[in-house]
Amino acid sequence: VFPDLKLSGILEGLCGQFQVEKVTSNKTGSRIKVYIVSKKLVQKEQLFCLEKNIKEQLFPKSNVEIVIVERFELSEAYTPQNLFEVYEESILAEFKADNDLEYNLFRMAEVTFPHENVMNLKLPAAFVPEMVEQKLKEDLYNIFAHRCGLD
């Protein structure tokens, strides 16, 4: 998709793990979204690094924002609990990049799995606006259900 993109090491190998489904741009051209699908988990920090490389190499003088939208087709061996164990740092990295409040709430939350497919999230005792709590739940649901294919 980006023939002029030069990657090395981990990023080069990373690109072999996924397929680009489509590339879109908003009307002003200020944001380009690259939709990828992978049969393996790709850590969010690696995708942030790939976004940065695309921006720096292909759009160095532009204010365009590059966003990689990932989707995983994982094996049925993944449950919410074992996915969380290997993907927690990526969830934290995503929250940190998007919303400091969500990041700090999630970082301080107590996460338990009373059943393999049920996640309980106990937020800190501090006052948390209901809309922030709801957004955190929605974001987690989107990560587990839509991105990773677990319901």
Over which residues does each language-model region extend?
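Intrinsically disordered, low-complexity basic tails and flexible linkers associated
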Residues: 1-151
